[in-house]
């Protein structure tokens, strides 16, 4: 089973590449979706996040309030490390389960791991190929504004 890591920064084109590879028959495992899945309401990961960061990171529906959590961890390397210590092991285990599930389809199955932060998440895996999506910073900012609805000022402030 060929295992391909697809990585790159925000709005670099990862999702477009992943969609095209899926159209060609690859099984795409989406790290961002796995993060959302392991942090779903009622999950052990979400309960641990609440224990560590407080009830104010949970919204009225019992889901993670990403903005509230972000306010606590971004800009504070120690807090971000605490969050990563909770989330990364669960993401690693679930992604491994999905890789194994894809492999059961046969040895020819190509598996693509769409992961924004490969170096932080799964750098030690035996990748057959690492693909880095790249686009110039001005193009990435344009995509963020036009395709994702980000405020132009916020896009300009990003370090890309």
Predicted regions and their residues:
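Short, acidic/turn-prone active-site loops that include or flank metal/cofactor-
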Residues: 33-36, 135-138, 158-160
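Residue-level signal for inorganic ion chemistry
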Residues: 13, 32, 83, 112, ...
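Walker A (P-loop) phosphate-binding motif
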Residues: 1-26, 30-33
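ATP-dependent small-molecule kinase phosphotransfer cores
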Residues: 33-110
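ATP-dependent NMP and nucleoside kinases share a basic, alpha-helical "lid"
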Residues: 92, 96-104, 110-146
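Short, structured coil segments at secondary-structure junctions
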Residues: 24, 53, 126-127
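Short alpha-helical
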Residues: 12, 44, 78, 90, ...
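An amphipathic alpha-helix signature
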Residues: 46, 50, 137-145, 152, ...
């Amino acid at each position: 089973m060929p295992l391909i890591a697809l990585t790159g920064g925000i709005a670099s084109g990862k999702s477009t590449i992943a969609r095209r590879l899926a159209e060609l028959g690859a099984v795409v495992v989406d790290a961002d979706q796995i993060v959302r899945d392991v942090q779903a309401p009622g999950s052990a990961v979400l309960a641990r996040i609440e224990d560590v960061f407080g009830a104010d990171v949970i919204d009225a529906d019992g889901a993670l309030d990403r903005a509230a959590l972000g306010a606590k961890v971004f800009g504070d390397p120690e807090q971000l490390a605490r969050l990563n210590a909770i989330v990364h092991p669960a993401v690693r285990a679930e992604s491994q389960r999905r890789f194994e599930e894809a492999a059961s389809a046969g040895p020819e199955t190509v598996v693509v791991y769409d992961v924004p932060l490969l170096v932080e998440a799964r750098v030690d895996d035996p990748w057959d190929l690492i693909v880095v999506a790249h686009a110039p910073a001005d193009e990435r900012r344009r995509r963020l504004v036009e395709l994702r609805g980000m405020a132009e000022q916020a896009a300009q402030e990003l370090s890309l």
